[in-house]
Amino acid sequence: MFYTNMETVHNCFNDATITGDEIIDILAFLQSDESDNPSGINEVVPVDDKKRRRTISNRESAKRSRMKKKKRFEELTEEVNRLNIRNQELKNRLANVVSCGNFISRENNRLKTESVCLEIRLLELYRFLVAMQSPISTSVNYITTLEI
Protein backbone atom coordinates (compact mmCIF):
# COMPACT_ATOMS: atom_id res chain seq x y z
CA MET A 1 0.00 0.00 0.00
CA PHE A 2 1.78 3.06 -1.23
CA TYR A 3 0.33 6.46 -0.71
CA THR A 4 0.54 9.37 -3.09
CA ASN A 5 1.31 12.93 -2.06
CA MET A 6 -2.40 13.64 -1.74
CA GLU A 7 -3.24 10.85 0.67
CA THR A 8 -2.65 11.18 4.36
CA VAL A 9 -2.31 8.64 7.04
CA HIS A 10 -3.95 9.31 10.38
CA ASN A 11 -2.16 8.19 13.49
CA CYS A 12 -4.67 6.63 15.89
CA PHE A 13 -2.75 7.60 19.02
CA ASN A 14 -2.38 11.36 18.72
CA ASP A 15 -4.47 12.28 15.69
CA ALA A 16 -1.40 13.64 13.86
CA THR A 17 -1.39 13.29 10.09
CA ILE A 18 1.50 11.88 8.08
CA THR A 19 1.60 12.26 4.36
CA GLY A 20 2.77 9.63 1.91
CA ASP A 21 5.87 11.70 1.17
CA GLU A 22 6.75 11.74 4.86
CA ILE A 23 6.48 7.96 5.01
CA ILE A 24 8.74 7.63 1.97
CA ASP A 25 11.23 10.03 3.58
CA ILE A 26 11.22 8.01 6.82
CA LEU A 27 11.81 4.75 4.94
CA ALA A 28 14.61 6.34 2.91
CA PHE A 29 16.19 7.61 6.14
CA LEU A 30 16.04 4.16 7.71
CA GLN A 31 17.55 2.56 4.60
CA SER A 32 20.33 5.14 4.43
CA ASP A 33 21.16 4.43 8.10
CA GLU A 34 21.63 0.77 7.23
CA SER A 35 23.95 1.49 4.31
CA ASP A 36 25.91 4.10 6.29
CA ASN A 37 26.68 1.60 9.07
CA PRO A 38 30.03 0.06 8.01
CA SER A 39 30.30 -2.33 10.99
CA GLY A 40 27.08 -4.11 10.09
CA ILE A 41 25.76 -3.88 13.66
CA ASN A 42 21.99 -3.71 13.93
CA GLU A 43 21.77 -4.40 10.23
CA VAL A 44 18.27 -5.30 9.13
CA VAL A 45 18.29 -8.56 7.17
CA PRO A 46 15.60 -8.97 4.55
CA VAL A 47 12.86 -11.43 5.48
CA ASP A 48 13.59 -13.65 2.47
CA ASP A 49 17.24 -13.99 3.51
CA LYS A 50 16.25 -14.88 7.08
CA LYS A 51 13.77 -17.44 5.78
CA ARG A 52 16.40 -18.91 3.45
CA ARG A 53 18.95 -19.19 6.28
CA ARG A 54 16.37 -20.71 8.61
CA THR A 55 15.40 -23.23 5.91
CA ILE A 56 19.06 -24.16 5.38
CA SER A 57 19.57 -24.46 9.14
CA ASN A 58 16.48 -26.64 9.47
CA ARG A 59 17.69 -28.89 6.63
CA GLU A 60 21.10 -29.28 8.26
CA SER A 61 19.49 -30.00 11.62
CA ALA A 62 17.18 -32.58 10.05
CA LYS A 63 20.16 -34.16 8.28
CA ARG A 64 22.10 -34.35 11.57
CA SER A 65 19.05 -35.86 13.22
CA ARG A 66 18.70 -38.47 10.47
CA MET A 67 22.41 -39.31 10.67
CA LYS A 68 22.20 -39.65 14.45
CA LYS A 69 19.12 -41.87 14.11
CA LYS A 70 20.85 -43.99 11.44
CA LYS A 71 23.95 -44.36 13.61
CA ARG A 72 21.85 -45.39 16.62
CA PHE A 73 19.95 -47.90 14.44
CA GLU A 74 23.24 -49.38 13.20
CA GLU A 75 24.54 -49.62 16.78
CA LEU A 76 21.36 -51.38 17.88
CA THR A 77 21.54 -53.73 14.88
CA GLU A 78 25.12 -54.63 15.79
CA GLU A 79 24.08 -55.21 19.40
CA VAL A 80 21.20 -57.45 18.28
CA ASN A 81 23.62 -59.48 16.13
CA ARG A 82 26.10 -59.72 19.00
CA LEU A 83 23.36 -60.81 21.41
CA ASN A 84 22.01 -63.38 18.93
CA ILE A 85 25.48 -64.90 18.62
CA ARG A 86 25.88 -64.93 22.42
CA ASN A 87 22.41 -66.47 22.78
CA GLN A 88 23.31 -69.24 20.31
CA GLU A 89 26.55 -69.91 22.19
CA LEU A 90 24.63 -70.20 25.46
CA LYS A 91 22.05 -72.51 23.85
CA ASN A 92 24.87 -74.73 22.58
CA ARG A 93 26.46 -74.84 26.03
CA LEU A 94 23.11 -75.64 27.63
CA ALA A 95 22.48 -78.46 25.15
CA ASN A 96 25.95 -79.83 25.90
CA VAL A 97 25.36 -79.65 29.67
CA VAL A 98 21.94 -81.33 29.31
CA SER A 99 23.50 -84.04 27.14
CA CYS A 100 26.27 -84.63 29.69
CA GLY A 101 23.69 -84.65 32.50
CA ASN A 102 21.62 -87.26 30.66
CA PHE A 103 24.72 -89.38 30.05
CA ILE A 104 25.71 -89.17 33.72
CA SER A 105 22.16 -90.04 34.80
CA ARG A 106 22.10 -93.10 32.52
CA GLU A 107 25.55 -94.15 33.72
CA ASN A 108 24.45 -93.70 37.33
CA ASN A 109 21.37 -95.89 36.74
CA ARG A 110 23.53 -98.52 35.02
CA LEU A 111 25.98 -98.52 37.92
CA LYS A 112 23.13 -98.82 40.45
CA THR A 113 21.74 -101.80 38.52
CA GLU A 114 25.19 -103.34 38.31
CA SER A 115 25.66 -102.77 42.05
CA VAL A 116 22.38 -104.56 42.85
CA CYS A 117 23.37 -107.45 40.56
CA LEU A 118 26.79 -107.68 42.22
CA GLU A 119 25.21 -107.62 45.69
CA ILE A 120 22.91 -110.49 44.66
CA ARG A 121 25.87 -112.43 43.23
CA LEU A 122 27.87 -111.74 46.39
CA LEU A 123 25.00 -113.02 48.52
CA GLU A 124 24.82 -116.17 46.38
CA LEU A 125 28.55 -116.73 46.74
CA TYR A 126 28.31 -116.17 50.47
CA ARG A 127 25.52 -118.78 50.74
CA PHE A 128 27.55 -121.17 48.64
CA LEU A 129 30.60 -120.63 50.83
CA VAL A 130 28.56 -121.22 53.99
CA ALA A 131 27.10 -124.36 52.46
CA MET A 132 30.54 -125.63 51.56
CA GLN A 133 31.86 -125.07 55.07
CA SER A 134 29.03 -126.77 56.86
CA PRO A 135 29.59 -130.60 57.06
CA ILE A 136 25.94 -131.51 57.38
CA SER A 137 24.04 -132.05 54.18
CA THR A 138 26.63 -130.39 52.01
CA SER A 139 25.21 -131.83 48.90
CA VAL A 140 21.67 -130.60 49.73
CA ASN A 141 22.89 -127.04 50.39
CA TYR A 142 24.94 -127.11 47.25
CA ILE A 143 21.95 -128.13 45.14
CA THR A 144 19.73 -125.50 46.83
CA THR A 145 22.30 -122.80 46.20
CA LEU A 146 22.57 -123.71 42.57
CA GLU A 147 18.81 -123.53 42.13
CA ILE A 148 18.66 -120.00 43.44
From Swiss-Prot:
InterPro entries named among the record's database cross-references: bZIP, bZIP_sf
GO MF terms held by the record: DNA binding; DNA-binding transcription factor activity
Protein name per UniProt: Basic leucine zipper 4
Region feature (Basic motif): 50-72
Species in which this protein is naturally found: Arabidopsis thaliana
UniProt xrefs under SUPFAM superfamilies: Leucine zipper domain
Pfam family, one: bZIP_1
Signal peptide positions on this chain: none
bZIP domain: residues covered: 48-97
Region feature (Leucine-zipper): 76-90
Function (record text): Probable transcription factor involved in somatic embryogenesis. Acts as a positive regulator of BHLH109.
Keyword Transcription regulation attributed: yes
GO cellular component assignments: nucleus
Region described as Disordered: 50-70
Origin superkingdom: Eukaryota
Compartment(s): Nucleus
Keywords of this entry: DNA-binding, Nucleus, Transcription, Transcription regulation
